[in-house]
Curated annotation (Swiss-Prot):
Keywords: Cytoplasm, Dipeptidase, Hydrolase, Manganese, Metal-binding, Metalloprotease, Protease. It comes from Lactobacillus delbrueckii subsp. lactis. Mn(2+) 2 binds at D223, D234, E341. The keyword Transmembrane does not apply. GO terms for cellular component: cytoplasm. PROSITE patterns: PROLINE_PEPTIDASE. Belongs to the peptidase M24B family. Its main location: cytoplasm. The lineage of its organism: Bacteria, Bacillati, Bacillota, Bacilli, Lactobacillales. One of its GO terms (biological process) is proteolysis. GO terms for molecular function: metal ion binding; metallopeptidase activity; proline dipeptidase activity. It catalyses: Xaa-L-Pro dipeptide + H2O = an L-alpha-amino acid + L-proline. Its EC number is 3.4.13.9. This is Xaa-Pro dipeptidase.
Amino acid sequence: MNLDKLQNWLQENGMDVAYVSSPTTINYFTGFITDPEERIFKLFAFKDAEPFLFCPALNYEEAKASAWDGDVVGYLDSEDPWSKIAEEIKKRTKDYQNWAVEKNGLTVAHYQALHAQFPDSDFSKDLSDFIAHIRLFKTESELVKLRKAGEEADFAFQIGFEALRNGVTERAVVSQIEYQLKLQKGVMQTSFDTIVQAGKNAANPHQGPSMNTVQPNELVLFDLGTMHEGYASDSSRTVAYGEPTDKMREIYEVNRTAQQAAIDAAKPGMTASELDGVARKIITDAGYGEYFIHRLGHGIGMEVHEFPSIANGNDVVLEEGMCFSIEPGIYIPGFAGVRIEDCGVLTKDGFKPFTHTSKELKVLPVKE
């Protein structure tokens, strides 16, 4: 079905060949994903010929046994992959003048190798925007996987909360989360590097976990996600370890109110900028606008950051079936940071989150 869309696009745009280079996009079109490391793993589609998946011999049998029911062409390490690709293309079609390439995943070295095989071809057409657009709208089968990934994120939060104790390092908490995800849920891949930030470290939104230790009476920020059958989760919660100060409670409640207001306001037909503005106004009116230093959200699907960008100034119209995050944050340098994030799907009835961990301020007991 997805590959039919690609072939139709080639025909409508006068293109002969599509060169798909990102493993994630190949998975979207074929149902097969692997990590080829430094080897060549590509999908070739044509306006009027059968597509083929090109992969290392190491992955050939796996690809043949996958959901992909088209041709698979493997190559040995002793072979030149680019000359073999050219041979396969010329077997299938005489039309290879006009190429559409996924520029987001095309390296200079690979472009040069292709151009050497097809010196008279035009590689200037970019597939990236088309791919981003068709991936915007999730099918029900995709939503099932996104919801499952959300359930895994909810489980991970509970493990992380339980792991907090006096003197434990941020990295040790991350290790416990990821170990229990593997042990109890069979999760073999997180969607990004798990973030646990305690105290003033939480004021640096994307700082990785450190050897900083958790201390009583501070906020701890968790940002985590998993991959479930090729689909990502991404969620954030902030908790108090021990009794928070009044200022900590204040910034938490302002942020929670802003996030819930944006969730309640989200509907088809509004722009991404308008949705960002809902949360941003609440935080600004409370006096913390300068500490909300990023966009409200981002799309999610097979990758943890996709289109659309829920950002001030982005006038893309939100539509039913789009999946994205709503994640306002307040980060006060040298003091603390708060972020609350849910990813979900926009329906005719509003925004439906994939994660359900409570957003009331959780005050965890101090443990030795």
